[in-house]
């Protein structure tokens, strides 16, 4: 059976939270690392439009670790609604697959 590889996006309300989340995942070897993408954000939250700066962690994992990533983020984040998405790329190059496997083993 082929392994599935995911591009992971995880939200954080600020850089401090993003660091805590990513460090926890890295210590457990659940993701390969991460880029921090900072941008202003706007949400409809509890009936009100809310503006804030947000950090998105962009990383990679595989199907073996997907559930553990979700569990760990839920334990680490301070967000009331943690936002995590796991996207299956249409294609992923061999070098990236090999690096993900080596990093997470």
Predicted regions and their residues:
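Positively charged, small/polar-rich N-terminal and surface patches that mediate targeting and assembly
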Residues: 1-105
């Amino acid at each position: 059976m082929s392994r599935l590889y995911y591009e992971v996006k995880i939200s954080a309300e600020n850089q401090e939270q993003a660091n805590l989340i990513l460090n926890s995942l890295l210590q457990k070897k659940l993701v390969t690392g991460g880029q921090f993408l900072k941008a202003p954000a706007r949400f409809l939250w509890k009936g009100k439009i809310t503006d804030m700066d947000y950090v998105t962690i962009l990383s990679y994992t595989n199907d073996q670790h997907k559930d553990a990533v979700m569990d760990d983020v839920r334990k680490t984040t301070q967000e009331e609604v943690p936002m995590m998405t796991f996207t299956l790329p249409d294609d992923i190059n061999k070098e990236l697959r090999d690096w993900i496997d080596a990093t997470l083993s």
